[in-house]
């Protein structure tokens, strides 16, 4: 199949484009949210950059939507409407940003476009109405068992921790820094120590490293810390588990499902997490054993093959929704935000 999708979430796309299809990524001269293309990523040759304005509409077999605005954009540019005469699936990456537990998904109550969540918690958190909703859990290209744990430090991967604050558990970092020095990787981590009130000697901002370098450097840390309060399941957590790192994670959203007890600690009790982090930093052998358990669990649940197989099944089924009108059913409710619809 020739599948059109925008490059919205780099890590997720990195897994998705390793399937057996041809992937069409819109590109614009200035890049940006609507034209990032490959963005220099080392992806297979089956990933092609396309100019949407000149793309042959009939060359697209299906589209993976990731933003509500893409529906109207494709109808305008291609002359084919997702869910009407263009097979489509909507991928929701995130938890609701506000209004939980009453947050209505923009595609709630339509049947033409399946709504895919990346975690079971996300599916539960959103009000999907009568939309066909399902879960396809993340898949991770295996980076290999790179863990050395040579540094008695805690590794954290988080983007924009200063701006996002409590959402990403930034306020919890001082407590972890009291246990062991922190290495923080991710976008816009400069100034984090000052913003969080942590001594510079206890926190090193590593910045946004390339994937291979990130994996290598992160794997040198003794323990991976996942302090996120309200985010979807971070792919960085799953990558750390694939690397063979033991995990200390806040028991929020999907973390309790992803991290088994033998991999470290998952708890809403911060003191319990701090005790576990301190013990693992002081005991390299235990840290390594728990890291092996983390890797085994991640390979079993979040392996790339299982992820791609699930997507193949869904893409093959587009247009044959049981009890529905198929891809030719003209459900105009997909064009109207849930909060503005009139009940039929």
Show which residues each predicted segment covers.
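Short hydrophobic beta-strand element within catalytic cores of glycosyltransferases
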Residues: 246-249
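Aromatic "clamp/platform" in nucleotide-sugar-dependent glycosyltransferases that forms part
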Residues: 229
């Amino acid at each position: 199949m020739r599948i059109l999708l925008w490059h919205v979430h780099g890590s997720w796309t990195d897994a998705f484009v390793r399937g057996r299809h041809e992937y069409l990524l819109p590109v614009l001269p200035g890049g940006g949210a609507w034209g990032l293309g490959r963005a220099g990523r080392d992806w297979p040759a089956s990933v092609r950059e396309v100019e949407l304005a000149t793309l042959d509409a009939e060359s697209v077999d299906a589209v993976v939507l990731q933003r509500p605005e893409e529906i109207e954009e494709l109808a305008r540019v291609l002359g084919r409407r997702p869910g009407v005469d263009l097979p489509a699936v909507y991928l929701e990456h995130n938890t609701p940003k506000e209004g939980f537990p009453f947050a209505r998904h923009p595609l709630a109550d339509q049947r033409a476009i399946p709504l895919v969540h990346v975690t079971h918690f996300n599916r539960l958190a959103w009000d999907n109405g009568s939309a066909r909703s399902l879960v396809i859990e993340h898949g991770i290209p295996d980076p290999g068992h790179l863990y050395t744990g040579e540094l008695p430090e805690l590794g954290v991967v988080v983007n924009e921790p200063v701006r996002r604050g409590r959402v990403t558990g930034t306020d919890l970092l001082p407590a972890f820094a009291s246990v062991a020095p922190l290495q923080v990787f991710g976008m816009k981590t400069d100034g984090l120590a000052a913003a969080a009130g942590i001594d510079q000697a206890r926190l090193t901002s590593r910045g946004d490293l390339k994937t291979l370098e990130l994996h290598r450097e992160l794997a040198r840390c003794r323990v991976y810390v996942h302090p996120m309060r309200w985010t979807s399941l971070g792919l960085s957590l799953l990558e750390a588990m694939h690397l063979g790192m033991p995990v200390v994670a806040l028991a929020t959203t999907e973390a309790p499902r992803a991290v088994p007890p033998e991999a470290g600690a998952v708890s809403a009790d911060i003191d319990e997490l701090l005790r576990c982090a301190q013990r693992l930093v002081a005991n390299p052998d235990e840290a390594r054993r728990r890291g092996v358990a983390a890797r085994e669990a991640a390979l079993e649940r979040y392996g790339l093959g299982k992820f791609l197989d699930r997507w193949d099944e869904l893409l093959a089924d587009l247009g044959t929704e049981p009890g529905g009108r198929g891809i030719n059913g003209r459900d105009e409710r997909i064009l109207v935000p849930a909060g503005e619809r009139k009940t039929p």
